[in-house]
UniProtKB/Swiss-Prot annotation:
Subunit description: Component of the cytochrome c oxidase (complex IV, CIV), a multisubunit enzyme composed of 14 subunits. The complex is composed of a catalytic core of 3 subunits MT-CO1, MT-CO2 and MT-CO3, encoded in the mitochondrial DNA, and 11 supernumerary subunits COX4I, COX5A, COX5B, COX6A, COX6B, COX6C, COX7A, COX7B, COX7C, COX8 and NDUFA4, which are encoded in the nuclear genome.
Principal location class: mitochondrion
Gene: COX5A
Annotated organelle transit peptide span: 1-41
Name of the protein in question: Cytochrome c oxidase subunit 5A, mitochondrial
Statement: the UniProt record of this protein carries the keyword Electron transport: no
Residues bearing the modification N6-acetyllysine: K87, K113
Pathway note: Energy metabolism; oxidative phosphorylation
GO biological process, one term: mitochondrial electron transport, cytochrome c to oxygen
PTM info: In response to mitochondrial stress, the precursor protein is ubiquitinated by the SIFI complex in the cytoplasm before mitochondrial import, leading to its degradation. Within the SIFI complex, UBR4 initiates ubiquitin chain that are further elongated or branched by KCMF1.
GO molecular function: metal ion binding
Domain of life: Eukaryota
Function text: Component of the cytochrome c oxidase, the last enzyme in the mitochondrial electron transport chain which drives oxidative phosphorylation. The respiratory chain contains 3 multisubunit complexes succinate dehydrogenase (complex II, CII), ubiquinol-cytochrome c oxidoreductase (cytochrome b-c1 complex, complex III, CIII) and cytochrome c oxidase (complex IV, CIV), that cooperate to transfer electrons derived from NADH and succinate to molecular oxygen, creating an electrochemical gradient over the inner membrane that drives transmembrane transport and the ATP synthase.
Protein family membership: Belongs to the cytochrome c oxidase subunit 5A family.
Organism: Papio anubis (Olive baboon)
Amino acid sequence: MLGAALRRCAVAATTWAGPRGLLHSARTPGPAAAIQSVRCYSHGSYETDEEFDARWVTYFNKPDIDAWELRKGINTLATYDLVPEPKIIDAALRACRRLNDFASTVRILEAVKDKAGPHKEIYPYVIQELRPTLNELGISTPEELGLDKV
């Protein structure tokens, strides 16, 4: 049974769609066939939403986080196709405050607004959830700074 699955994967890896959508044999199967066969039957673990949130909250709550790690985390988080939960943003804002990096706080809030896209109800919800943290840390939103009119 495993051999049949490997053969199916190897065949899939050695064919390609031509300009009319017809399958043609690849010119040289090479090592891609072996790599593809492994991918066809592997079952990776999936991270739940709660595990994802906990991973990022833990990352930003590291007491020894430095400015480079903070920016790396913000950039990585911004590449995901999602709007981070308020608890992740809260942890990131607190990390910014520990590092006295006001520019990053504004950047985080602008990124959240951008990630919300056409869903106009998401950003106000996130700001509403973060309002106690923003007040506690003395952070102004981009709108309060007048940056939304630029």
